[in-house]
């Protein structure tokens, strides 16, 4: 995380050793604990920031299950955040407070509540990092084994949060390959609601490690009280909400302990990933804006820098890489105003040339039959064509048909005494990042490229296989259950080494599409590939859901060819452009197959996107109409921090004769300002009625503007796709 680079201000505040309300505050919210020496630390409150009088009168809930970090053993029916087997075999643990302190870290403060077991030498620190400039609190736990022998951790949540029962709804994301980020809203009912991941390498294809709780009924986008929670972890996770016979829902989040019990050696400390918590009184979109601001400033690499408009080669040529073709694609994207060209899979392999997906991963040497002038030749072409150059790698993986596997079969994850289950191409395996030698190798893949070719500006880092074979050839027989955790500890070490040496390179996080859209992974990356499905219609749904937790600057959204290569739908070029312009704009197409008219439309759109790019990538998101509400359209908008500029998106989702769509009311504007309207990416023969006119923010938010359902174009160009992008500037 970026906080690792913030100088620690050496100020520690010790709190009194008596009953004490410990207040963890941001600018707009508070998390309150009751910490009394010799007693369990307890939750009092999480919500909007309390004034001193309300804080003084806050009472401790009498329910003993309000412990801030409940441990298993003495209240066995209760759900536990921590469970362990002590070195003598005892399964019971009790935790009482021993003190509290606060340290300032740049733009944040870290409150530590110290707990210990009165019988065993086990210490647990509850950590809370509160930011001064964004409403986000990160909660995590550190467990120290002071016993004489090894302690086995069987449950080790990052945090637990009690939520008062009522009409509480949960919003979360699910999906699969090519259909990531699907949004669901569900009322919490008695019982357990569990979201978990067991993939091993990628953790956001099927479910996401982030949720929102709407406290006033089914969530509204721009009104209502909402708790947002995101587990900042790249590996297997478990989010669990327990609703029993008490007055509370109990939300637990942390590493998925399934097949991952951890043997904590004497003197060793185990640190859980952080759970990022936010609170919004402005609905679901308000919680999203908090995540976006926090992510841009404290998690993403280069979260304050505009992203380049790029052309990626994958859907244009797939494995058919060659020097002349790459040069032509660079020239084409430059001619349309693009700034970066990325060469995808298929450029490497000598003994086993990468002409398909069944070989050569791990053999990161240029195939000179395809690229006789090598990477340097491509960089020369990029300079000639005045674009930056990027390259695809998949460094965590190998194929059985590779020189790497032939040399180091002991480097792969493989169950002993069993034939391996193979992945993509029938030959793919995952390298064991718990092994320091493998960590060195993976770091070396990037290091060798960037040392030899320092002008490489962008890396697309892919990961196309789960950990299918549980077995580490590096870890001891007794520590095989550490594999899932040790893999991601090793991964983090590699990314930290890369970022320490190569601070400026842009790195995209790709994993069979959107398999790594999570804040734990993004701590060293600039952006992620939302999905391998580039169909504009389905991207509206996926990007709407994904925007609940991730900002536009991190969401790679590309214009692709039709029929779409995944769902075979044919949409208009304008529609594809208008969807892609709502994220980090790029192209996933073979330009030589485009007509001059299509290139001209893209050239115009890219030029206009450059004008609105700061608003889209750094502005506040307001979701207006959900595609999931079956109203026949979807709409969002971005508003600059000063509320002097905004970009409004409107996409029609269904086409029926005599259809009646709602007029969309805008949000986030200054009601007292006048905004001049300009349509972007225009294809119509006549302007919109609102074109060039000015409206008050109050009018736009209370009444909105009518959008024509069809485009006014010549008969031969009519189709069933309609979309609008409006640029608003305050006068």
Q: Could you say what each language-model-derived stretch is?
A:
Residues 302-444, 453, 457-458:
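Aromatic-lined carbohydrate-binding/catalytic grooves of carbohydrate-active enzymes
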Residues 20-33, 39-242, 258, 674-690:
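Polysaccharide-binding surfaces and accessory modules of carbohydrate-active proteins
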Residues 28, 141, 267, 382, ...:
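Conserved, mostly hydrophobic/aromatic
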Residues 372-374, 406-408, 412-574, 584, ...:
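Active-site neighborhood of glycoside hydrolase catalytic domains
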Residues 28, 93-94, 262-281, 721-729:
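Short Pro-Gly-centered flexible turn/kink motifs
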Residues 654-731:
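C-terminal beta-sandwich/jelly-roll accessory domains of carbohydrate-active enzymes
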Residues 73-95, 223-235, 279-300, 338-345, ...:
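Glycine-rich, aromatic-flanked loop segments that form ligand/cofactor-binding clefts
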Residues 28, 211-213, 221, 627-671:
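Carbohydrate-binding surface patches
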């Amino acid at each position: 995380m970026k906080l690792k680079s913030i100088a620690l201000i050496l100020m520690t505040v010790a709190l009194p050793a008596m009953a004490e309300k410990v207040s963890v505050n941001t600018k707009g919210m508070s998390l309150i604990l009751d910490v009394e020496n010799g007693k369990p630390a307890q939750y009092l409150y999480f919500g909007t920031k309390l004034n001193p009088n309300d804080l003084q009168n806050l009472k401790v809930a009498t329910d003993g299950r309000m412990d801030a970090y409940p441990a298993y053993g003495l209240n066995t029916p209760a759900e536990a955040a921590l469970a362990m087997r002590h070195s003598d075999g005892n399964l019971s643990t009790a935790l009482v407070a021993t003190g509290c302190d606060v340290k300032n870290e740049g733009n944040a403060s870290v409150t530590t509540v110290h707990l210990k077991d009165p019988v065993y030498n086990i210490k647990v620190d509850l950590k809370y990092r509160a930011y001064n400039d964004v409403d986000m609190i990160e909660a995590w736990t550190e467990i120290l084994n002071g016993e004489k022998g090894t302690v086995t951790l069987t449950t080790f949540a990052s945090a637990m949060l009690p939520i008062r029962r009522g009409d509480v709804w949960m919003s979360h994301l699910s999906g699969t390959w090519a259909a990531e980020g699907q949004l669901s809203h569900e009322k919490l009912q008695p019982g357990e609601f569990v979201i978990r991941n067991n993939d091993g390498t990628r953790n956001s294809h099927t479910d996401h490690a982030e949720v929102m709780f709407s406290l006033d009924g089914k969530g509204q986008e721009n009104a209502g009280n909402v708790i947002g929670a995101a587990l900042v972890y790249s590996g297997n996770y478990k989010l669990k909400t327990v609703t029993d016979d008490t007055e509370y829902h109990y939300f637990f989040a942390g590493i998925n302990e399934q097949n991952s019990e951890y043997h904590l050696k004497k003197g060793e400390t185990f640190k859980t990933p952080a759970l990022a918590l936010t609170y919004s009184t402005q609905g679901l979109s308000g919680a999203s804006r908090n995540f976006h601001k926090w992510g841009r400033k404290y998690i993403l690499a280069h979260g304050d820098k505009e992203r380049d408009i790029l052309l990626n080669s994958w859907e244009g040529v797939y494995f058919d890489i060659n020097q002349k073709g790459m040069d032509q694609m660079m020239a084409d994207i430059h001619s349309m105003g693009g700034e970066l060209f990325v060469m995808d899979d298929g450029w490497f392999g000598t003994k086993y040339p990468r002409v398909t997906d069944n070989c050569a991963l791990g053999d990161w040497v240029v195939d000179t039959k395809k690229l006789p002038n090598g990477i340097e030749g491509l960089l020369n072409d990029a300079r000639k064509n005045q674009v930056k150059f990027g390259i695809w790698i998949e460094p965590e993986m190998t194929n059985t048909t590779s020189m790497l596997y032939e040399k180091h079969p002991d480097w792969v994850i493989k169950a002993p005494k069993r034939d391996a289950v193979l992945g993509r191409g029938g030959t793919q395996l995952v390298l064991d990042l718990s092994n320091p030698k493998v960590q060195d190798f993976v770091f070396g893949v990037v290091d060798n490229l960037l040392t030899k070719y320092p002008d490489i500006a962008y890396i697309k880092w892919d990961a196309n296989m789960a950990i299918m074979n549980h077995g580490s050839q590096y870890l001891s027989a007794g520590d095989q259950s550490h594999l899932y955790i040790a893999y991601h500890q090793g991964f983090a070490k590699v990314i930290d080494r890369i970022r320490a040496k190569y601070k400026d390179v842009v790195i995209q996080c790709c994993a069979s599409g959107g398999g790594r859209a999570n804040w734990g992974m993004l701590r060293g990356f600039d952006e992620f590939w939302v999905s391998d499905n580039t169909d504009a219609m389905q991207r509206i749904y996926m990007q709407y859901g994904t925007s609940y937790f991730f900002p536009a600057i991190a969401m790679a959204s590309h214009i692709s060819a039709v029929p779409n290569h995944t769902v075979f739908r044919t949409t208009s070029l304008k529609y594809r452009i208008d969807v892609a312009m709502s994220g980090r704009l790029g192209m996933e197409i073979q330009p030589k197959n485009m007509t001059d008219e299509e290139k001209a439309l893209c050239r115009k759109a890219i030029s206009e996107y450059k004008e609105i790019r700061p608003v889209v990538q750094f502005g506040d998101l307001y979701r207006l109409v959900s595609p999931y509400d079956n109203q026949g359209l979807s709409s969002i908008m971005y508003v600059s921090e000063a509320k002097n500029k905004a970009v409004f998106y409107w996409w029609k989702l269904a086409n029926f004769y005599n259809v009646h769509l709602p007029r969309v009311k805008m949000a986030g504007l200054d009601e007292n300002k006048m905004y001049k309207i300009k349509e972007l990416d225009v294809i119509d023969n006549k302007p919109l009625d609102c074109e060039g006119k000015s409206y008050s923010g109050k009018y736009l938010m209370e009444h909105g503007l009518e959008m024509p359902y069809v485009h006014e174009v010549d008969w031969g160009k009519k189709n069933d796709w309609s979309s609008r992008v409006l640029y608003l500037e305050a006068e």
